[in-house]
Amino acid sequence: MLASVPAPRPAKKDSAASRRKSASKSTGAAVKDGSSARVSASGAAESPKQSCAQVHGVDFQSLVHATQEETLRAVVSSLPTTGLQATQIGRARQLVQQILHHRSPEDRVFLAYTSNMISCGLRDTFTYLARERLVDCFISSAGGIEEDVIKCGGSTLLGQFGQDGRALRRRGINRIGNLLVPNDNYCWFEDFFTPVLESVQEAQRASRWKTHTAPSEIIEAMGAAIAKNHPDTCTSSLVYWCYRNGISVFSPAFTDGSMGDMIYFYNFSHKGLVVDPLEDVVRLRKLAAKERGRNLAIVLGGGLPKHHLLRNVPMDAVVMVTTGLEADGCVSSGVLADDVACGLLREETETVRVQGDATVVFPLMLIAETAATREGAAA
């Protein structure tokens, strides 16, 4: 027969009285020293009031009878003291206001953006900045150039994020997030861009190919072509206003898009067209290397535009907006410590990084401060 195994004795439950007794023993030493159990658990409290602002948000009760403009300004001016990413947006807004409206005449302002910023409605915002000469240099990928020009020939429409890509493709519609671009827009762009390439190659031929053409020169030629051939729609274009106001536009990945396809196929029938991106690296560095003034940047999104700008231009102040995460381990998502470690930023660079969607937060940063909102933020 198997020997019977005694059942395990149930664990003794602590009573409330025993728990209180145990807690009393653990804090006894602190009580004998004249301190409380609370201080023993969390450490001595220090008051940071002298160096830190108090957290508070929007008092909507005081805005019940306010106008829409007054309410909007109250919301925006409350961002710095709201906490979390709202505070970052508020700090970024204050720095953007300084960069755009309170800089010295010798300072240079750079704006780097990803192509989706032009595909969406931020194109109108960038156009305003170029029209008012608030930015001295724009940097983007190929899509950030061609999508701007394409909108002069056809509209980009609002769709939905979940629309079936295969069904749209069969209908001749391209989808960028929840934005829809008909194929006809790209056909229009091909008809527009090919004569630009022909004029560029003719200039190279006239010089007996002693000079090469930089992407920024092709972009400038595109601005001139918009002004000449599409006067009714040119004023909506960032490329046009940069051409008209003499603002540099650089696209280091100029062939990574529809323009690259067209240059590729163009060279089958028109041999000898040379596009030299190194010319633009020299121009960008010369622009940033002036003896007087500071280099100031607004970086919307990451990837190539951010990396190309920051690796070539030593910055004095930078505002960054990104949806990337540090876990990605790429330049698009790098936190400030990563950018300093990689040499993209100097330790002394004044920097504000916002984790958020630029389509939402950047327009808020452009709302000008009044004397009242500045006083409210300071309080």
From Swiss-Prot:
Name of the protein described by the UniProt record: Inactive deoxyhypusine synthase
Gene3D superfamilies reported in the protein's UniProt record: Deoxyhypusine synthase
Keyword annotations from UniProtKB, A to Z: NAD
Oxidoreductase keyword on record: no
A single GO molecular function term of this UniProt record: deoxyhypusine synthase activity
Residues binding NAD(+): 115-119, 141-143, 147, 256, 302, 323-324, 357-358
Disordered: annotated segments: 1-48
Binding site for spermidine: E146, E147, D261, H307, G329, C330, V331, D338, D339, V340, A341, C342, G343, L344
Family: Belongs to the deoxyhypusine synthase family.
GO cellular component, one term: cytoplasm
Pfam families, sorted: DS (PF01916)
Skewed-composition ranges (Low complexity): 36-47
Domain of life: Eukaryota
